[in-house]
Structure formats: C-alpha cells, structure tokens
Amino acid sequence: MWNKRSSPLHTNVVKNENSTIRDIVQRAARTSAAKQVVQSIESRTVTEITSLAGSAFALYLSVVAHKTGGVHICVADDRDSAAYLAGDLYSFLGAERVLFLPSSYKRSIRYGGEDASGVVQRTAALEAIRNHKGEAIVVCTYPEALFENVVSAESVSQTVVEVSVGARVSMEELQQRVEELGFERVDFVHEPGQYSMRGGIFDIFSYSENKPFRLDFFGDEVESLRRFELSSQLSTERLQSVRIVPNLKNFASETKVTIAGYVGDAVWWMDNLDHTLARLDEERRKLLAESENPADDAQRVTSAKAFLGDTEGRRMVLRRASVKRPAEVQVAFNTQPQMAINRQYDLLAEDIEARAMQGYTTY
C-alpha cells in the first residue's frame, strides 16, 4: 500500500528485514493519524478508522498498541481473517506479543467436536490475558470464538496449579490435585490433559502450552523444571516455575463469563461490530433452538446484548461505521492498495520509478 502523505508503506524484497520493518514502524508512528488514534484511545472515545489498505491495518495497530500498552483484542470477520491478521502482526510486534484466540470447536459449539489445538491456543491466549504485565499484547479472534463464554479469571486463579523449583510437595499430592482437575494418567504424555509418573519424574501437558513440562523430584522437593520435546523426550528449556492449566471448557457454566467480561479494560478493535453482533445472536438462536437443555446452554454462550453491555465504556476502534455503537471520532489514514500488476513486472518497475520521482521510498 501507498501512503499519500509520506513515504509508501509497501513491503517488497528487502536486504535487511528487521531494520526495514523498524524503519517502517518508526515512520508510521510519526504520522498524525496514528497519533490521533492514540489520543482517542487515551481519552476513551469510540473511534472509526478509514482508508487502511492491505497490511497497513496491522502496521498501525502495532504502533498504537505499542504506544498505549495493555491488552488489545482484534475481532476479525472470520477465522481466516483473524489468522492472517495475526501473521501480519508477528512481523511488527514479534510472536511472543501476538496471540490467536480460536473457538474450542472444529465447526461450531452446536455440533460439538472439540478441536484439541484450538483448546490449547484458546487457553494460552486467556492465560496471557489473565497474567498480562509489561508490554502490550494483541489477541486476534472472531465472532464464533467470542460466542463461547469462558471461566472467570477469579475461578481460573483458584484452579491453576503453580509449581516452582524448590517447592515442598510430594508427587502423590500433585497427582491427586491434577486428577481432580481432569488430567489423565498415561505411560507417556502426548497431548494436553495427560500426565505420567515414573521414578522421581512427573511429566504433565498443560492446556496452555504447546510442549509438556517435566518435573524432577528429590523426595518431596521439586529439584528441577523443564520443557521437553515429545518426539525426542529431550529437554528444550529449564524453568524456575510453571503453571499447570486444566481444560477450562469443562468447568461449570455458572463460573463462566463473556470474553469481554474476562478481559476487563482492554482495547477492542472491530473489523465490523454490527456483523459480529449479528453473528452472536444468530449462533445463539440456532443453539438454543436445537438444545435439549436451553437453560444450561444459555449460560455457556454470549449474546449481542451481553457483549455490548460488557464493552460499554471500554475503548473501541471501528474499521467500519456501526449503527449499534456510533463512532465519536473518525481518523483517515489515506493509504492506497498497490496496483494490480498480474505478473507484468514492467508495470511494477514503472510504478516504483514514478513513485521515487514523487519522493516515495519503496520497501
């Protein structure tokens, strides 16, 4: 994409990717539009942003998140769009500050069919939000994932098992606790929700991790903590403490809240707020119409009304105008998509040359 007011924010082949991305981010941070959005968020106004082409949205989102800090929740129109956005954000913020919060199900909560990888990613994102400190984090999600209510942060805090090197606890006590949380004993762990014991070694696969933990005991004391690879069984990282998180989806419905209620004072970035609200109510209507126990199922999921209530007074940035929550401020970024060249590289060369004569820089 090209920015009319300054250099083009178009990424092509680069010699030094990291330094080039830093330069692009620094240029974006100096634009008046980015500064306006930061000011709007700090003053807690609902802001509509326009004229953001291609990856410009991810670029400016990363700039604003870095400036304002905290937790930023980006709601895309669908799963694929959320995943693509997360991929763009990795380039600007780094993978450790970008999370993907999917649904727990392969298709829909209406059909069941739990998605194991989705449960792990979802739990990891929720844990990152609950334990957030320091630099901003950005969580990418979509309506079907927002539809499922989650265990309240207070209930999670009472459930998560935290173990540190040097802790005085027996393997038997730890075994009893994790079984109460629904973990299953196996010979060798290979997926979240499993644990194994042999000699003084206690392996366990938390639902918030993509690799299992290995706890080495000396008597009733935790001597060491490590992550390890499933395929080789070799340690990859030594740790000072670990959090063992169960499958939060299995908790009683009365302990659950909407994701908007769970995240608290986050900044919400909505691709299309009215579309999201319509999807929430449509999914809820279908679920309850097919449910054998509608009273219980109603507690498992959210609604448009609940989402609007839980985000009332929260900071929100809209990519499209909303009838349900009109913007108080509008900010235009004036970026343009790159021209379609359809493999006619002479056209690309001519365009780059013309832009250079106008004072643009090509990345």
Describe the function of each predicted region.
Residues 2-363:
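ASCE RecA-like P-loop NTPase motor cores
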